[in-house]
Amino acid sequence: MKKLISIVLLFSFISFAFAQNATVKGVVKFSGEAPKPRLISMKADRQCDAIHGGKQVQAEDVVVNQNGTLKWVFVYVKEGVKGKYNPPSEPVVLDQQGCWYHPHVFGIMVGQKLEVRNSDPLLHNIHATPKKNKPFNIGQPVKGMKSYHTFDTPEIMVPFKCDVHPWMSAYAGVLDHPFYSVTNDKGEFEIKNLPPGTYTIEAWHERLGTQTQTVTVKAGEVKTIEFTFERKK
């Protein structure tokens, strides 16, 4: 009975603690006329080309959604986080499917496993070129192969490429805390479970640069902010 009461009290404390935390959410907008989608031909590799039926594939470096927002923007807390956070035991998955990296942009914590998969029946190589972390270049010639990696130092951002297929690219935001998000096909992001405090929030886009805002959140508050990027001249 005492054990049951202790468990109930523990869960009550955890629920109370999370209820006291805040959320920062919002959208990332694009100002001006959206650029024409950049199309990629995969004819250099017959197998890749066949997977897509000979059709060109839209690049993901600048994706303006139908509602005028931006996809694939990495939004994270740049300054203000206190304390230490343990990485999740669940790995982040970077898949190679259709001669393409999935997802194009993602976040991962220091010490968290990155699982790189090859879902294609052909050779890929995962070539990470960080500046602060140790680079790696691993070949995966067989469908279903997996490799695992971790990062030791926070870094914004770590680029990935495939030397076999030069159109393949991805980016990882490596942080020592879990407060980050990536915009979706509506341009939305959401950073949950922030302790009350003042934070610098940065939005990173691979072509359009970065923007920052300072926000202060109270216990249990949900704060909405917006970022707006425009085409570089």
Predicted regions and their residues:
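Sec-dependent N-terminal signal peptides
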Residues: 4-14
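N-terminal, intrinsically disordered, basic low-complexity segments enriched in Arg/Pro/Ser/Thr
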Residues: 16-18
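Extracytoplasmic copper-binding redox domains, predominantly the cupredoxin/blue-copper superfamily
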Residues: 20-233
